[in-house]
Amino acid sequence: MQNTLITIALRGITVLPRMRIYLDMNRPMSIAAATNAQKTNQNVFLVAQKDPSVENPGQEQLEQFGVIAQVKQIIKGPEDSFRVLVTGLQSAKLESIEEYVPNLIARVTVFESEKNDEQEIHL
């Protein structure tokens, strides 16, 4: 199933499904994406950058796979930094970047979960 989602490029971190984590953000594009998603109650697509030094990554600078996540909380930090609490929901594949301004918008293919939430893996 394909979706179009607000996208946040992550530097130096990967978020996985079911993971809850605070992300430190200071890029205006990332802050705008998180704020827009929270205001409109939309999920976001989180995808790692191949090279963290690239300030405004295009599709070729992004990894092929990421995670759909929910923005739970945004906390204003010192200066222009923000801490954003996200929860990873499902894995997804980046198909294309549709827009770049004011934030990235990506078309992604969602991987349906094969595992029932009540199942556990025992080793």
State each model region's role.
Residues 1-123:
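N-terminal low-complexity, acidic/polar interaction/targeting segments
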